Amino acid sequence: MKFLALALTILLAAATQAVPMQADAPSQLEHVKVAMMEYMAQVKETGQRSIDLLDDTEFKEYKVQLSQSLDNLQQYAQTTSQSLAPYSEAFGAQLTDAAAAVRAEVMKDVEDVRTQLEPKRAELKEVLDKHIDEYRKKLEPLIKEIVEQRRTELEAFRVKMEPVVEEMRAKVSTNVEETKAKLMPIVETVRAKLTERLEELRTLAAPYAEEYKEQMFKAVGEVREKVGPLTNDFKGQVGPAAEQAKEKLMDFYETISQAMKA
C-alpha cells in the first residue's frame, strides 16, 4: 500500500513537468498536487461507498479494516507528497530544461531541413513539369481522337439533315400555295360582301345626291340671273376689267356645272 502511494506521488510529480515547455513548473506542480489530492479523496469516497454496501453482520470487521486502510492511504499520499515536494520541483526544473533543449534541437533540425530543401525546389519543379508533360503527351492523342470523332459525327449528322432541310424548304413553298388556295375563297367571299354593301349604300344615297344636285343647279342659276344684269350695267363703266370678271364668273359657273353633271 505504501509503495502504491509513493508511486502515485512520484508519477504525479513527473507528469506535472512533462507537459509544459515553459519555466512555470512549480506553479503547475502545485495545481497537479491539488488535483491528485482531490482524486485520492474521490477514491476514498468511492471505496467507502462500496464498503458500506457489505453486510454489517458478516463483514463488519472487514469493513472497519478497509475503511482504515483507505484513511491510511490518503494520509500517506498527502505526507509523501509534502516530503517529496523539493525533489519533485528539482526534477521538474531538470525536465523543463531538457524539454527546452529538445525543442531547440528539433527547431534546428527543421531549419536545417528547410535550408537543404530550398535549392531542390527548382529540381522539384523540373520533375513536376516533366511529369505533367508526360501526362499531356499521353492524353493529347486521346483528346484529338475524341475531337475528331465528334467532328465526324457532326459531319454525318449534317449530311443526314441536309436532305431533310431541303425537303422541308420545298414543303414550305407547297404549303404556302395550299394555304393561299384555301384563303382565296374566303377573300373572294369577303370582297363580294363588301361590294354588295357598297352598292346598297350607293343605292340608298342616290336620291339624296340627285336632290343635292338639283339644289346646286338651282342656286347656280339664281346666281347667274343676278350676275347677268350687273355685268351689263358695269360693262361700260369698268371696261376691260368688268369683262374679265364676267369671264371668270362664267368660267366658275361652267366648272360647277360640269362637276354637278359628273
UniProtKB/Swiss-Prot annotation:
Return the similarity comment.
Answer: Belongs to the apolipoprotein A1/A4/E family.
Provide the residue span(s) of the region labelled 3 X approximate tandem repeats.
32-63
Instruction: Give the matching Gene3D superfamilies.
Output: 1.20.5.20, Apolipoprotein
Q: What is the lineage of its organism?
A: Eukaryota, Metazoa, Chordata, Craniata, Vertebrata
Give the main location: secreted
Q: Supply the gene name.
A: apoa1
Q: Where are the sequence repeats?
A: 64-85, 87-107, 108-118, 119-140, 141-162, 163-184, 185-206, 207-228, 229-239, 240-262
Q: Where is this region: 10 X approximate tandem repeats?
A: 64-262
What GO cellular component is one of the record's annotations?
very-low-density lipoprotein particle
Location(s) in or outside the cell = Secreted
Keywords on this record? Cholesterol metabolism, HDL, Lipid metabolism, Lipid transport, Repeat, Secreted, Signal, Steroid metabolism, Sterol metabolism, Transport
Q: Which GO terms describe its biological process?
A: acylglycerol homeostasis; cholesterol efflux; cholesterol metabolic process; lipoprotein metabolic process; phospholipid efflux
The record ties this protein, via Pfam families, to: Apolipoprotein (PF01442)
What are the boundaries of the signal sequence? 1-18
**GO terms assigned for molecular function:** cholesterol transfer activity; phosphatidylcholine-sterol O-acyltransferase activator activity; phospholipid binding
Identification of the protein by name? Apolipoprotein A-I
Q: What does this protein do?
A: Participates in the reverse transport of cholesterol from tissues to the liver for excretion by promoting cholesterol efflux from tissues and by acting as a cofactor for the lecithin cholesterol acyltransferase (LCAT).
